[in-house]
Amino acid sequence: MLTNRQLLILQVIINDFIRSAQPVGSRTLSKKEDITFSSATIRNEMADLEELGFIEKTHSSSGRIPSEKGYRYYVDHLLSPRKLSSNELVLIQSAFQEKIFELEKTVQKSAEILSDLTNYTSIVLGPKLSENRLKQIQLVPVQPNKAVAIMITDSGHVENKTITFSEHLDVSDIEKLMNILNSRLAGVPMDQLKDRMYKEVVMLLRTHLKDYDHILDALGNTFTSTQNESKLFFGGKINMLNQPEFHDIDRIRSLMMLIEQKNDVMQLFHPNQQGITIKIGSENNLEAMENCSLITATYSIDQKSLGSIAVIGPTRMDYGRVVSLLHHVSKDLSNALSNLYDE
């Protein structure tokens, strides 16, 4: 259990290191308004904090820097969300006031806002395609027995699939098929298309098209292969180059390689998490993230979580400010998407 004096010294060390990226010595601490103890007392308390594992010494300086354990204690017990400036709030609100009719553009906008305001890297995990509904399907003949199905969702996502029919279909048959699919499947969730097709489309195919069973098989294969993965949106991919910790070429290379690997990035998100979570250094379970912290928030519609929005920064990131920014951006993103889905 830390004493009040140790808590104060730890908090001041971390706040100063977040601001300056320079190790903090007892002389620096003695000049702080909040610190009224003697230099000898400060040195003794710092020695105790180091022995307890909350701060550590660097090789190149006599000062101390926070350890991962120190950051975790700070986040869990000492952190207060930072009040955002009126300019920051206006920037966030104005970005979502712009009329955007596609989910993906709205989500990308939120990633860009966060990276601009934090100067860190932001990642938004978009909703799974199964959360989208089919808005329209277009069929474009490319060969006598082939057509490209262009599926457009209510989020603005576009997916192209090649349909191979066992028999030749003329243009009028393609048009009939397209009209039937749009009349019965528009508004249906993407992961329910195949089931709905066998329940509602099959009778119309039988009535209006010959060889309907072959057409049904071809459509079934197409809808089965529809992607169900979440899409990743990034903001400020190279922002970490501006952070002193990442002037080390090997360190920044590892992080850049991680960001380019979708499977690795997906490991940073947990499907059942709610609210705002903070993972520090090794807690991310990825070697490239050992010098980084990840703060994640969820966004939702009608209390149903759709995806996650995250900020990657150095372990000395400004936690209080980033937590506040994530809170506001995730809330405004949720409101913007609710309005989009209601239209």
Curated annotation (Swiss-Prot):
Domain of life: Bacteria
Keyword Transmembrane helix attached: no
Keywords annotated in UniProt: Repressor, Stress response, Transcription, Transcription regulation
GO molecular function, one term: DNA binding
GO biological process: negative regulation of DNA-templated transcription
Pfam families xref list: HrcA
Transmembrane segments: none
Listed NCBIfam families: hrcA (TIGR00331)
Family named by the database record: Belongs to the HrcA family.
Function: Negative regulator of class I heat shock genes (grpE-dnaK-dnaJ and groELS operons). Prevents heat-shock induction of these operons.
HAMAP family: HrcA
Record's protein name: Heat-inducible transcription repressor HrcA
Species whose genome carries this gene: Bacillus pumilus (strain SAFR-032)
Taxonomic lineage from the root: Bacteria, Bacillati, Bacillota, Bacilli, Bacillales
Name of the gene encoding the protein in the UniProt record: hrcA
